[in-house]
A protein has these predicted regions:
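Conserved RecA-like ASCE ATPase "motif II neighborhood" in helicase/translocase motors
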Residues: 374-399, 406-413
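Conserved RecA-like helicase motor-core motifs
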Residues: 346-361
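ATP-dependent helicase/translocase motor core
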Residues: 2-324, 333-348, 371-374, 380, ...
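Conserved coupling/interface region of RecA-like P-loop/ASCE motor cores
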Residues: 453-475
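Conserved small/polar residues in nucleotide/adenosyl-binding loops
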Residues: 476-481
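Conserved nucleotide-binding/hydrolysis micro-motifs of P-loop NTPases
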Residues: 168-170, 203-206, 332-334, 381-383, ...
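Conserved motor-coupling elements within RecA-like helicase/translocase cores
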Residues: 362-374
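Post-DEXD/H (motif II) to motif III coupling segment of the RecA-like Helicase ATP-binding lobe
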Residues: 409-461
Length: 481
């Protein structure tokens, strides 16, 4: 069968058409037609190059018009350099923070002194101010190997998206085993900058990150929470590759978790992304909600702790004044777990989580009267009902874990007395009871729901079955004893 009519190419063409005609990406077919050279198809001088420097340098000048030619070269050199002994994950992590936060460049001031400025690589505020390019059938060579990828997606010349496709009759896992793992070994430079890995046969699609085992790749089934859900590639492309969403995921929904003695790259799951953005929207409109932003009900095992981290990360990045975020639990073990998660995911900088944990009611008040980035506390430490209220000149956001527990009652009242201007979101893994007026009074109604039934359908958690069994005991045996 000719290439033009093979089933996997039909899947590839459908994906390319959607990216181009619906999502607004430029799409180029490089199969046997790419011309090398600065003025060639992609501006590459060799098949070993994965960073498209033509588009990269154009974007740098567009986003940073103050760059001189020498500074432009300096920025490119810093972005492409890496330690030869670094692992692929270490290189990927380093590149990620440069493309997210900007590349430091030395600038000479009029008085002759120098200062460090940050050169933006991507315009996260204005998606249309970036160049989105998808290249089909792109040749990539290393010293020993030659490969050709199905689709690679570039933003400003940076290869952020990898898509491996199979025909509909082939299991998606084959794309992981036969192709992706091979590319990791043979053309690792392709993944230095990668943010998203997609595997699909058209009818089913999975997305993951560098370093993930196949079982941790997940579906992207919905564009909004109310959708029934579809596992097809079209839904994933619409849900991830829409330009604004793509940049939102890139900037705010990727973590590097350092727990367990190794680095794990985390991408928000579909339900986390949708739920967290509902919470962000509620926070944006906090002045209209009298502090009660709502209850975030995502069933047990669906990644609630990471959702809290994603929410904190986005709010502190996107809102002027960066609020103090107070994380509440009701048990010491939970308090340590959630604070460790924030630390291991880098949200606390280089400061240990213990420095942000309130040791007593008095220490809690002392911390809150300052301007800390985070406070972790037990709800029981709101135990000073006569303490004067705090009216800070900055916002305070309270994230309460397992907000429905009954013992929150009196302490929740103390909390609202002490922090009358704070906004509050309650996180829970179980539905609220119909007569739970305390939680509603404290946090409001549901702002995001991801229940057990949907989580099981999505594979985000597993069902627990109870089987009522008893051993059979003979009556004769009982009489004998």
């Amino acid at each position: 069968m000719s290439r033009e009519y093979s089933e996997n190419v039909l899947v590839q063409n459908s994906a390319g058409n959607l990216l181009q005609n619906v999502l607004g990406w430029e799409v180029v077919l490089a199969y046997n037609s790419e011309k090398l050279g600065p003025d060639g198809t992609l501006g590459r001088t060799s098949y070993g190059e994965v960073l498209l420097t033509r588009y990269f340098r154009q974007a740098l000048l567009r986003l940073n018009p103050w760059l001189t030619p020498n500074q432009l070269d300096e920025v490119q050199k810093k972005f492409t350099a890496h330690v030869s002994t670094a692992s692929l994950m270490q290189i990927n992590e380093e590149k990620y923070f440069l493309l997210r936060d900007g590349i430091p460049v030395t600038v000479k001031r009029p008085d002759g002194r120098t200062e460090i400025r940050s050169a933006a690589v991507i315009d996260f505020k204005n998606p249309e101010n970036n160049h989105f390019l998808a290249v089909k059938e792109m040749k990539i060579h290393s010293q020993l190997y030659r490969r050709r990828t199905d689709i690679v997606g570039f933003v400003n010349g940076i290869p952020l998206l990898f898509i491996e496709l199979k025909k509909p009759t082939v299991d998606v896992q084959n794309a992981y085993i036969d192709n992706y793992r091979d590319y990791l070994d043979t053309i690792p430079q392709l993944f230095y900058y990668n943010a998203f890995l997609m595997l699909s046969n058209g009818l089913e699609a999975k997305v993951g990150t560098l370093g993930s085992k196949y079982e941790f790749f997940h579906e992207w089934k919905r564009l909004k929470e109310s959708d029934a859900g579809s596992v097809e590639l079209e839904t994933m492309l619409r849900g991830i590759c829409e330009k604004k969403t793509f940049l939102d995921l890139l900037e705010n929904f990727i973590l590097y978790d350092y727990s367990g003695g190794c680095t794990t790259k985390i991408l928000a799951r579909n339900h986390q992304y949708l739920g967290v953005n509902e919470a962000v929207s509620a926070y944006e409109n906090r002045k209209l909600k009298d502090g009660r932003l709502g209850v975030f009900w995502h069933t047990q095992g669906s990644g609630k702790s990471y959702s809290m981290v994603f929410l904190a990360q986005k709010i502190r990045r996107k809102f002027v004044g960066s609020p103090t975020i107070v994380v509440l639990t009701d048990r010491d073990e939970l308090n340590r777990q959630i604070s460790d998660t924030f630390e291991n995911c880098g949200l606390l900088g280089k400061t240990k989580a213990s420095q942000f944990i309130a040791s007593s009611g008095t220490d809690l008040v002392k911390k809150l009267r300052g301007n800390p980035s985070f406070v972790f506390t037990l709800i029981q430490k709101f135990n000073l009902p006569k303490e004067p209220p705090i009216y800070p000149d900055h916002d305070i956001l309270i994230l309460s874990d397992e907000a429905h527990r009954s013992q929150y009652g009196i302490f929740a009242d103390n909390m609202m007395h002490l922090l009358p201007t704070a906004s509050r979101i309650g996180f829970t893994g179980t539905p609220l009871l119909a007569d739970d007026h305390i939680t509603e009074r404290t946090f409001g109604g549901y702002l995001s729901v991801y229940d057990f039934k949907r989580a099981v359908e999505d594979g985000a958690t597993v069902p627990l079955y109870y089987e009522n069994r008893a051993d059979t005991v003979s009556y004769t045996h009982l009489r004998a004893h």
